[in-house]
Amino acid sequence: DTTLVGSWAYNNTYNECWGVAINDREFAIIGSTEGTHIFDITNPSSSYEVAFIKGGYTGGGVIHRDYHDFAGFLYIVCDEGSSSTLQIVDISNLPNSINVVYDANTLLTTCHNVYIDTATAKLYACAANSAMDVYSLNNPIEPTLIYSYNGVGHVHDAFVRNDSAYLNCGNEGLKIFNFSNVNQLGDQPILLGELTSYPDAGYNHSGWLSDDGMLYAMQDENHGYDIKILDVSDVNNISVISTFNSGVNPNSIAHNGIIKGNELYISYYHDGLRVFDISDPYNPSQTWIYDTYI
């Protein structure tokens, strides 16, 4: 059911969203031009804001904030502004309170995307000080730089599971590394595989790995370029097994995707939320639609 059951008006533009479950309640984390908003959405029809963290940089120039959580802490980055910071917030006591435990630009100022491999306590900061920087979170409130990657112009986004990092490298395609040996500065990851030539190859923007690790859904951020499903069961022989789109407009752009079970959730720039059944990855079918322009 794609009926809208709750909403919240705010006098600024929203950008990124994230979600956490804490103390038997569910929370939505949403970025805006002013900072980070945390909503209790346990009952989505009566959601309400429980906390707000002002950004280090605010105003209409803020287009990108990004989030990930680990060990009861929320990690916040922003891709705009010379006064931006890395913010770490203790959210373990939600909905009652939060506590900003770190707010500084010592490690990074701007950063486009952040992803945490929770199984290995490593934070991947995309397009920050280098193409991508990796930090140890052995102490969650004191990240320690353990690796900087400059093998490409920049890494736009990353998906990491158990030290296997799927890196979206813009016009330089997809690269997959193993970071299990990277624990301190000087250590080097192992390149497992890469894909630079494929149908509708453009600006390799984002992707998500299936629960079983066999499939990878990938989006190139170009007008009219299809979503791709990749067979990554053998990273030495990555293959595109299907391509598809929303069917709305030949110039539409698929932005970000998340896989949950057999469903692929795609946010489009103009076509809203689209959900595809990928139980047959060779023949995905569109099953749910929500028009965010309504």
Label each PLM-derived region with a short phrase:
Residues 1-294:
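Feature marking well-ordered beta-strand scaffolds used for ligand recognition
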